[in-house]
Amino acid sequence: MSDTRTAAMTSKAWPFEEARRVLKRYEKNPPEKGYVLFETGYGPSGLPHIGTFGEVARTSMVMRAFQEISDIPTRLICFSDDLDGMRKVPGNVPNPDALTEHLQRPLTSVPDPFGTHASFGAHNNAMLRRFLDTFGFEYEFISATEFYNTGQFDEILLRAAAKYDEIMAVMLKSLREERRQTYSIFLPIHPESGRVMYVPMKEVNAQAGTITFDSEDGEEMTLPVTGGAVKLQWKPDFGARWAALGVDFEMYGKDHSTNTPIYDKICRILGQRPPEHFTYELFLDENGQKISKSSGNGVSIDEWLTYASTESLSYFMYQKPKTAKRMYFDVIPKAVDEYHQQLRAYAGQDTAQRLNNPVWHIHGGDVPASNMLVPFSMLLNLASVSSAEDKSQLWGFIQRYAPESNPENNPDMDAAADFAVRYFNDFVKPKKVYRAASDLEREALEDLRDQLKAYDGPVDDEALQSIVYACGRERFDPLRGWFTALYEVLLGASQGPRFGGFIALYGVQETVALIDAALAGELLSDD
């Protein structure tokens, strides 16, 4: 056994902990199907949101961890529930009123409001796949519509008809009395209107593989359960899909957790072993509300990628999946800088430490070196004091700090400068509020200015930080009040960088001029 595999078998990183649970399923015999199957499900009722991406990213991390501890082949399936009826019209699509007449039709039978695909479901599936492809995920996409219509689900549907009473008994226990009267695990699709019907069954004929029911307008109908004429209610569908595909691992949000025993029982009734599952906490927007596909709150994948790299988003997804996290624009700079801190740490770590480092899981063990010369938060401060409209303005500061660097030989730094200018103009600039210095703060700022004016030492972060400390230590206890003053008076922000590093990048004499402008009240007019 290699050193890496040995370390992986005891690693406390959560993807390895999950991978070991999956491996335990096959400690006696390998899977009959010849591979271990990881699955993620996607409900394409609205535009794909960042939580959807997170599920695939995290599942991929578990699959990659499994590959490190086992030689059994793996597959990752992304399954889209696009045969679901459209229950309500999403608010974040063009011409929503035009979709009203298509309520209750499968999403793949609803016209695409964007006018680019054969259906709304196809549009949203394409959006999801584009996002996943951007991140280089290796996955197989399965459409529920295709899965049902091409007969791939037929064997399980016929088994569900044969086990109808058993599955119904599981479901009825979970329903309120009034719902029990009309509930059926089978949802017929009206042959003419195309609508998914929620009607009780008059007969389920397992031998013939048919169901008989009265349609919503009172007409008695008999349909085969096979070939896409009928779909399963979503809870039975969950367990049935596990059985049909032989799923070994699936993760889903906390909102599904109470249904897990139902999914498991149905999978067993249909003759298969349920998968290992992992429940993650939900993402919240800045107001603490759950991010939802249909309302479009929170940060979209495209929005994150407007302001930061794909790796920073993967880093955010790795962190504490069982803790509810607010996901809004303010978290982006922290995610970028922490990701690069972990990259820099990785080079000096031993095997066990590397396997516990988030970047191992983000990059699947093939971890690059960080070439982020200047932290993202520092770039934002430089953009702030220079009112940067273009990344070339930031490169002037970057090259002062690292003369050998340029956009051509450091494309990652170039991209970060571009992201920082965008982020500054969209989020920092509108919120900038400068304030005047108090008498004590003015005295300290004048002292700092005078010491910087007279400074003829090296442009070194630590040397300059010592001057900043000295000016504050004589006057402020705790020292935090001094740094808060620097940020609020000079940068118009509530927090900021290590100030010595800021001076080194921005320039000593430029910082002197900035202090003079602040003390003269010139920055207050920007408010």
Swiss-Prot record:
Molecular function GO terms recorded: ATP binding; lysine-tRNA ligase activity; tRNA binding
Coiled-coil stretches: none
Motif ('KMSKS' region): 290-294
EC number from the UniProt entry: 6.1.1.6
UniProt short sequence motif 'HIGH' region, positions renumbered to this chain: 44-52
Ribosomal protein found in the keyword field: no
Annotated Pfam families: tRNA-synt_1f (PF01921)
Biological process, per Gene Ontology: lysyl-tRNA aminoacylation
Any one GO CC term of the record: cytoplasm
Reaction(s) catalysed by this chain's protein: tRNA(Lys) + L-lysine + ATP = L-lysyl-tRNA(Lys) + AMP + diphosphate
Binding site for ATP: 293
Family: Belongs to the class-I aminoacyl-tRNA synthetase family.
Protein name as annotated: Lysine--tRNA ligase
Organism: Roseobacter denitrificans (strain ATCC 33942 / OCh 114) (Erythrobacter sp. (strain OCh 114))
Upper taxonomic lineage: Bacteria, Pseudomonadati, Pseudomonadota, Alphaproteobacteria, Rhodobacterales
